[in-house]
Regions:
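A short, exposed helix-loop element centered on a Lys and neighboring polar residues
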Residues: 112-113, 154
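Alpha-helical segment proximal to the catalytic Tyr-Lys
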Residues: 117, 158-162, 219
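Substrate-binding pocket helix/loop in short-chain dehydrogenase/reductase
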Residues: 88-89, 96-98, 191
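Short C-terminal tail/terminal secondary-structure segment
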Residues: 2-5, 222-253
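Catalytic loop of short-chain dehydrogenase/reductase
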Residues: 126-148, 153-162, 174
Length: 253
C-alpha cells in the first residue's frame, strides 16, 4: 500500500502501460510507493489493471476521456508495453514486422498524442526502449521498432519542451522478465558473455530510474537516453550474440 499524500510523487497521476506483470508491474508498484496515483493498463488486464491495447487509437481516446473526467489532468506517462519477435532479416514476415511496430512504436506515439494534452507544465513522459535501439541487434522487427521509438522520443522532447513537459528514454538490457524467459539458453549465455557486469538485470534495476525521471529531481533532464544494461552497449558487441543464434554457427571455443 502507498500513501498518496506523501512521497516524491504525491498528488501526481501517472499512467503505466504493459503493467499487468514483469517490468511494468514493478514500475507501477514503485510509482505507487512514491505516492503517485497509478493508472495501470495492459492488453491482458488482471485485478485493478485497466484494459488498454496500445496499438488502438480508440482505446487511447477512451482512456484520455476517462482521465479528463476523473482527474482533469495527469502528470506522467510510462510507455512500457512492448512485444518481441526474434526472426532475422531474411525470415521476418511483413505482417509480423508491422505488428511489432504497432505496439512498440505507434503505441507510445498514440499515448503521447492523446495524453500530453492533459499534462500541465512539470509533467514527464518515460519511454521504455531497449539496448537493441543502440546496436545492430539481430531480431529486425524488434530492433527497428526501438530505433524508431528513439526518434519519436527525441521529437517529443523537442516539441513538448516549451510546454514544460519532459520526455526521456530508458534502454534496458537483459532484464529477467517473462519476455526474456522465452529466450533460448544460447541467447542468454551469449548476451551475458558480452555484458561487462557479467549478470542479467532485474526489474528492480529499472523501476527506480523510472520513478526518478517522473520526479521533480529530474526537472532539467529531457531528451536523454539512459542505458540500464550492465555495460552491454558500452562496447557494442552484439555481433557475437547474432552469430551465436545462427543455426549454422560453430560452437564457441
Amino acid at each position: 500500500m502507498s500513501d498518496q499524500h506523501t512521497g516524491r510523487l504525491a498528488g501526481k497521476v501517472v499512467v503505466v502501460t504493459g503493467a499487468a506483470g514483469g517490468q511494468g508491474a514493478a514500475e507501477a508498484a514503485a510509482l505507487a510507493r512514491a505516492g503517485a496515483r497509478v493508472i495501470a493498463t495492459d492488453v491482458r488486464p488482471e485485478g485493478d489493471v485497466r484494459r488498454l491495447d496500445v496499438s488502438s487509437e480508440s482505446d487511447w481516446a477512451g482512456l484520455a476521456t476517462e482521465l479528463k473526467e476523473s482527474y482533469g489532468e495527469i502528470h506522467g506517462l510510462v510507455n512500457n508495453a512492448g512485444i518481441i519477435r526474434r526472426e532475422r532479416l531474411g525470415e521476418v514476415l511483413t505482417a509480423d514486422f508491422a505488428q511489432v511496430q504497432a505496439v512498440n512504436t505507434i503505441g507510445p506515439l498514440l499515448g503521447i498524442q492523446h495524453l500530453a494534452p492533459l499534462m500541465p507544465p512539470g509533467s514527464s513522459i518515460v519511454n521504455v526502449g531497449s539496448s537493441a535501439a543502440l546496436t545492430g541487434y539481430y531480431p529486425v522487427a524488434y530492433t527497428a521498432s526501438k530505433w524508431a521509438l528513439r526518434g519519436v522520443s527525441k521529437i517529443a522532447a523537442m516539441e513538448l519542451g516549451p510546454r514544460g513537459i519532459r520526455v526521456n528514454t530508458v534502454h534496458p538490457g537483459y532484464i529477467e522478465t517473462g519476455m526474456t524467459a522465452a529466450a533460448t539458453p544460447a541467447f542468454r549465455d551469449a548476451t551475458l558473455r558480452e555484458t561487462p557486469l557479467g549478470r542479467s538485470g532485474s526489474v528492480d534495476d529499472i523501476a527506480p530510474l523510472v520513478v526518478f525521471l517522473l520526479c521533480d529531481e529530474s526537472s532539467f533532464i529531457t531528451g536523454a537516453e539512459i542505458p540500464v544494461d550492465g555495460g552491454l552497449t558500452a562496447h557494442g558487441g552484439v555481433k557475437s550474440i547474432s552469430d551465436a543464434m545462427r543455426t549454422d554457427a560453430p560452437a564457441p571455443e
